[in-house]
């Protein structure tokens, strides 16, 4: 057995197991030389910077926040593997704005989980939680109560001037009576929604919709559907209670309605879950926890501050890193490609492998080890490849095996050379629920029989004695006797199940006999309901194949139901 076949067989065996433990291996350092990891860090860092620039300059990004955040986490891991400092939070925000903000936009650090939240809250007091509204960050500047500037966030220091769009956004007061002589507010322009439930509907592209309306040269009718959520009042009142009350009086009601005091991390957990499921007038992607005490505005910088933190909702899209690529040969001779990924948990299910279909499909995806893909769970919890979101810079060439000689009627026996993978797949199917459904008999057992040369064809196991079965390492006499009895009882399985177990391409009635079915002509098969000419030819080829005839003759000698000779 060559190395390729051994690799295929061993992977086929483990792919039939269920993952019941483990952890998402995001903290694993890649097994790369120092020169390569340096190249990969640089490439990923540049890509993240491009996406960040698109987000802050254009209001949207080619990737979702979920994808960006997870790839940013991956960059941190790679940097730590080389002993490099984490620069992701302190790196200046890219942007090309020309208008200076009176007070810089600080941005938010992201808390990874409840443990990180608890750690950050420890020792802090006067904390409040708000929904993290998913919109376009802006600065509002009022002089003597009159709105004089509406600036985009830009790079946090300078932004674009959108003041001419402000009169078309009814949610923004154009004049505030009794306002401070100089009033600077920071907040989020968002698309007004009618009872939006984040848990059910997700982001619905709301932020990009608002950004597009703001960036148009002429005013868009959509601006009338834009709301504003004020989340920062630099150099404003010292208490949050006073801030939200005054904001409401000035014409910004959402901040008061959606700001809640919290005493412990459990309060934050409760509000986060509530807002995730409750009908809201805006799209959200998490919550923000902030403390009342904050520095004077002149000390704010365009990097995340320490007085507020974001705790985002669980990602809607899950990234997995491709660890290896395996090629498996199924019982019908069709090859499939299975991606082995670093373990990832989706909806309480651990994912380690993803079947992506044919070799042709794999080539179309252009996936190599080290690439990062997005996964989702399809029907019955089966993982599905959605997209490739990041390709490693150095791509190792992988050559798929040549399976041209394999087909639906090949490898009913262990030999000739190269048949082991398909032969093993046939045995797994035979003992599985689609075949004879022999409990406790799977790929591992069949591989042991093949390895010890105790089986050479698809039904040779019927000749095994308890002593031969017990000779397999790890199988004692008691279990060997149980397996032997299971094999003997399999002889009484219905004829139709035996045909399915052998690979017959059509279900037949339970009371049929081999010799009766064998006498049917091609035209008789073709006229049967649900078969047709093409399926009839497949059936005829199956009956006429010498290996199938040999299997039937053997089953006849074993007095298997339906295969007995009749007078």
Swiss-Prot record:
Catalyzes the formation of phosphodiester linkages between 5'-phosphoryl and 3'-hydroxyl groups in double-stranded DNA using NAD as a coenzyme and as the energy source for the reaction. SMART domains: LIGANc. GO terms for molecular function: DNA ligase (NAD+) activity. It is an enzyme of class 6 (ligase). Keywords: DNA damage, DNA repair, DNA replication, Ligase, NAD. GO terms for biological process: DNA repair; DNA replication. InterPro entries: DNA_ligase_B, DNAligase_adenylation, DNAligase_N, NA-bd_OB-fold, NAD_dep_DNA_ligaseB, NAD_DNA_ligase_OB, RuvA_2-like. This is DNA ligase B. Its EC number is 6.5.1.2. It comes from the Bacteria. Belongs to the NAD-dependent DNA ligase family. LigB subfamily. The keyword NAD applies. The keyword Signal does not apply. It comes from Yersinia pestis bv. Antiqua (strain Angola). The lineage of its organism: Bacteria, Pseudomonadati, Pseudomonadota, Gammaproteobacteria, Enterobacterales. It catalyses: NAD(+) + (deoxyribonucleotide)n-3'-hydroxyl + 5'-phospho-(deoxyribonucleotide)m = (deoxyribonucleotide)n+m + AMP + beta-nicotinamide D-nucleotide. The active site is at 132 (n6-amp-lysine intermediate). HAMAP family: DNA_ligase_B.
């Amino acid at each position: 057995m060559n190395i390729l076949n051994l690799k295929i067989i061993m992977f086929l065996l483990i792919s039939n197991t269920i993952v019941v433990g483990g952890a998402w291996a995001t903290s694993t350092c890649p097994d790369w030389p120092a020169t390569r990891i340096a190249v990969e860090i640089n490439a990923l860092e540049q890509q993240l910077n491009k996406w960040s620039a698109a987000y802050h300059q254009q209001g949207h990004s080619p990737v979702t926040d979920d994808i960006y955040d997870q790839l940013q986490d991956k960059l941190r891991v790679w940097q730590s593997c080389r002993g490099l400092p984490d620069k992701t939070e302190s790196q200046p925000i890219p942007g090309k704005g020309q208008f200076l903000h009176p007070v810089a936009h600080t941005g938010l650090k992201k808390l990874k989980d409840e443990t990180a939240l608890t750690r950050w809250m420890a020792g802090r007091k006067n904390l409040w939680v708000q929904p993290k509204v998913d919109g376009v960050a802006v600065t509002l500047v009022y002089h003597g109560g009159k709105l004089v500037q509406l600036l985009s966030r830009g790079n946090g220091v300078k932004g674009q001037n959108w003041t001419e769009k402000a009169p078309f956004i009814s949610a923004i007061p154009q004049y505030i009576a009794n306002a401070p002589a100089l009033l600077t507010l920071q907040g989020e322009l968002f698309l007004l929604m009618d009872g939006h439930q984040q848990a059910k509907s997700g982001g619905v592209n709301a932020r990009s919709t608002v950004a597009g309306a703001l960036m148009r040269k002429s005013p868009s009718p959509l601006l009338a559907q834009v709301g504003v959520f004020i989340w920062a009042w630099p150099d404003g009142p010292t208490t949050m209670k006073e801030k939200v009350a005054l904001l409401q009086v000035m014409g910004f009601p959402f901040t008061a309605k959606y700001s809640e005091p919290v005493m412990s991390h459990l309060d934050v957990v409760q509000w986060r879950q509530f807002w995730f499921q409750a009908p809201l007038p805006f799209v959200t992607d998490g919550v923000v926890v902030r403390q009342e005490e904050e520095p004077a505005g002149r000390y704010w910088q365009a990097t995340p501050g320490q007085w507020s933190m974001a705790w985002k909702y669980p990602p809607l899209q899950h990234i997995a890193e491709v660890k290896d690529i395996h090629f498996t040969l199924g019982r019908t001779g069709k090859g499939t490609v299975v991606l082995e990924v670093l373990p990832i948990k989706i909806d309480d299910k651990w994912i380690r492998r993803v079947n992506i279909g044919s070799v042709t499909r794999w080539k179309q995806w252009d996936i190599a080890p080290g690439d990062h893909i997005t996964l989702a769970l399809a029907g019955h919890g089966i993982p599905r490849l959605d997209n490739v979101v990041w390709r490693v810079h150095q791509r190792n060439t992988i050559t798929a095996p040549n399976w041209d000689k394999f087909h639906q009627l090949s490898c009913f026996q262990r030999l000739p050379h190269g048949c082991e993978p398909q032969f093993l797949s046939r045995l797994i199917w035979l003992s599985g629920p689609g075949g004879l459904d022999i409990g406790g008999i799977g790929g591992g057992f069949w591989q042991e029989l093949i390895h010890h040369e105790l089986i050479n064809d698809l039904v040779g196991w019927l000749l095994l004695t308890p002593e031969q079965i017990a000779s397999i390492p790890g199988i004692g006499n008691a279990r060997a006797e149980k397996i032997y009895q299971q094999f003997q009882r399999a002889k009484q399985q219905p004829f139709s199940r035996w045909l399915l177990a052998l690979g017959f391409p059509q279900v037949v009635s339970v009371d049929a006999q081999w010799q009766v079915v064998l006498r049917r002509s091609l035209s008789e098969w073709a006229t049967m309901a649900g078969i047709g000419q093409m399926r009839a030819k497949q059936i005829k080829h199956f009956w006429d194949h010498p290996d199938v005839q040999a299997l039937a003759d053997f089953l006849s000698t074993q007095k298997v139901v339906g295969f007995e000779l009749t007078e």
